[in-house]
Amino acid sequence: MEKIKKFTDIVDIKNKRVLLRSDFNVPVFKEEIHDKTRIDVSIPFIQNLLKKKAKVILISHLGRPKSEKDMNLSLKPIFKYLQEKIDHKIHFYSHKITNNTKEKISFLKSGEIIFFENIRFNVGEIKNDENFAKNLSSVA
């Protein structure tokens, strides 16, 4: 049986897209993050990807939105915090994930991040929709 590779076994990720789902489900009230621990723990790994010149596609969720645009659960405050902590270009993608998302993010350069808005704003994420999964995997 073939051994499953660990991410640390992969040496060359230069110019490759890496889809990273991080747990940024943290307490946010009035656009202020009240516990940054989960974010801070992820930063060294993200920085390592950037150091290796990967194109980082970062996704996460926050809470359980009641609608597709519950702005109280936007990841924008986390995006702003990451901009302060990571010395690399970070883009914010506020659109739904569709079959043409890959084209829309084709501008992403090595050593940059695109941070997607709350993944749970996409109905397909909540419903475990196969087409949504295909669209999401196509960006990587």
Model regions: which residues?
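Active-site loop-to-helix "anion-binding N-cap" substructures in soluble metabolic enzymes
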Residues: 1-140
